[in-house]
């Protein structure tokens, strides 16, 4: 138990250190941008006097460590700066975009988890038989299929040809229009989940096969314990530790994929926000989106790591 608490403590201590490192790195790299925020906000025709006044007002001529400390002070209070001629709030833009990205990520994760666990268990139970062979082909296809390419195929099939699902348009709120919400999110989620499903199916199958070949399983079967009890209680519980951990670590990968998929399907998430920032030379918006995505990735992975410590009895009982 003491070992468990010590491991948890290490991860909690690592969180603020990693978060600080991310903000330093992103801010430092963005300081090399040749885009002048003054011209972005005031327009290309701004006079030198107006540009100088803008620089003076926002401290753009200060050394980057000074600007970083000021930025962090504002960030702690929820102020990530502004973007555009209208001085829109970066924090407000991210607050509307981040939930969309997280929803797409976890819908894709749920689809990938359910399908891969079912297929992996079936493939292991029917090892080297036709269900196993079919599932192996499916998993290879998933590994070989890029999400972007699958997204285009889904749009061509379900939006252009069958005309049953929308490929763009507003994203309805789930509570007011659940059918419209699911219809808008299902294709992006499938495109995001398919490669993950292929990989996780192989991992689940391998873990199940290794567990089924262990001596305690043979002894339980020899003692007359029903197969459902052996597989459902003992084998699954032990075999799924590694797949669950791997699945958790894939959340960051899915977030990165979701950012790209959102652009293809024109979803109002972080991908669209960062594209808007790049196209408009909005350094504050790009910087804010990158920092938030990186921090979300770090937090999720540390939480998953802590959950792994909880579900792994060998660590929990030390």
Where would I find each of the regions flagged by the language model?
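Alpha-helical transmembrane segments of integral membrane proteins
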Residues: 2-7, 98-131, 147, 176-318
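Membrane-water interface segments at transmembrane-helix boundaries in multipass membrane proteins
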Residues: 87, 137-202
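Juxtamembrane/transmembrane-helix interface segments of polytopic membrane transporters
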Residues: 22, 26-30, 151, 155-159, ...
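N-terminal signal-anchor/signal peptide hydrophobic helix marking the start
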Residues: 9-19
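An internal, D/E-rich "acidic patch" concept
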Residues: 1-4, 61-117
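Residue-level recognition of pore/gate-forming positions within transmembrane alpha-helices
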Residues: 15, 45, 113, 140, ...
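Transmembrane helix irregularities
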Residues: 33, 142-145, 255
């Amino acid at each position: 138990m003491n070992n468990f608490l010590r491991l948890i403590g290490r991860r909690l201590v690592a969180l603020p250190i990693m978060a600080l490192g991310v903000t330093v790195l992103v801010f430092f790299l963005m300081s090399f941008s040749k885009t002048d925020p003054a011209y972005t906000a005031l327009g290309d025709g701004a006079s030198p006097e107006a540009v100088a006044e803008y620089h003076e007002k926002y401290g753009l001529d200060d050394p980057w460590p000074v600007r970083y400390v000021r930025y962090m002070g504002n960030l702690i209070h929820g102020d990530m700066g502004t973007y555009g001629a209208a001085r829109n709030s970066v924090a407000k833009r991210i607050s509307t975009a981040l939930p969309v990205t997280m929803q797409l990520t976890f819908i894709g994760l749920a689809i990938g988890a359910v399908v891969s666990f079912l297929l992996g268990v079936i493939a292991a139970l029917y090892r080297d038989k036709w269900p196993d062979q079919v599932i192996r082909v499916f998993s290879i296809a998933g590994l070989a299929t890029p999400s972007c390419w699958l997204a285009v195929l889904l749009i061509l099939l379900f939006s252009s040809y069958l005309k049953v699902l929308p490929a763009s348009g507003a994203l309805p709120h789930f509570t007011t229009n659940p059918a419209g919400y699911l219809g808008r999110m299902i294709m992006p989620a499938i495109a995001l989940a398919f490669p993950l499903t292929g990989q996780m199916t192989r991992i689940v199958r391998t873990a199940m096969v290794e567990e089924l070949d262990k001596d305690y399983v043979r002894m339980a079967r020899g003692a007359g314990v029903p197969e459902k009890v052996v597989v459902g209680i003992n084998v699954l519980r032990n075999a799924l530790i590694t797949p669950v951990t791997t699945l958790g670590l894939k959340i960051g990968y899915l977030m990165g994929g979701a950012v790209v998929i959102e652009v293809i399907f024109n979803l109002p998430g972080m991908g669209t926000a960062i594209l808007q920032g790049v196209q408009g030379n909005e350094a504050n918006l790009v910087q804010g989106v990158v920092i938030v995505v990186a921090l979300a990735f770090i937090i999720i992975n540390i939480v998953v790591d802590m959950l792994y410590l909880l579900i792994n009895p060998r660590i929990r009982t030390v």
